Amino acid sequence: MKKFQILVVEDDAPVRNLITTTLRAHDYRFITSGTGEGAVMEVASHNPDIILLDLGLPDIDGVEVIRRVRSWSNVPIIVISARAEDNDKIDALDAGADDYLTKPFSVEELLARLRVTQRRLELIQNVSHEQAVYQ
């Protein structure tokens, strides 16, 4: 399975380090941002394959980041947040998040969710390729 590039958007250094250490140990490529504005700029400039996004960012709320990114990109967004209330999850998913993982989380669950997202991306790419071949 191809290792996609992941944008990690997390302002809490220990959590960001846990995520990036896990990604590095499993040969994922990644870039990081500690702010929502920085995340939007990273998506525009680096076009990551997957975004891991915290909601509680210091400048703009993660749900607003989702809305901004969704206005021009379909990149899969997995929220990783301490916000565990149903309304927080619903707001993020309705804004365009593809998945929601609550903190604290296990690295095994994070990796499993990344694998699921990768499978979806590969399926979409395969279908797009097949459509192009038959046109």
Spans of features found by a protein language model:
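Conserved acidic carboxylate
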Residues: 10, 57
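Short, Lys/Arg-enriched segments at the junction into DNA-binding effector domains
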Residues: 4-5, 118-135
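Short hydrophobic/Thr-rich beta-strand motif most characteristic of the beta2 strand and flanking loop
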Residues: 27-36, 42-43
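The feature encodes the CheY-like receiver
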Residues: 16, 58, 85, 103
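Active-site residues of response regulator receiver
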Residues: 54, 81
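Charged docking surfaces used in two-component/phosphorelay signaling
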Residues: 17-25
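Acidic catalytic/metal-coordinating carboxylates
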Residues: 35, 61-64, 69, 88
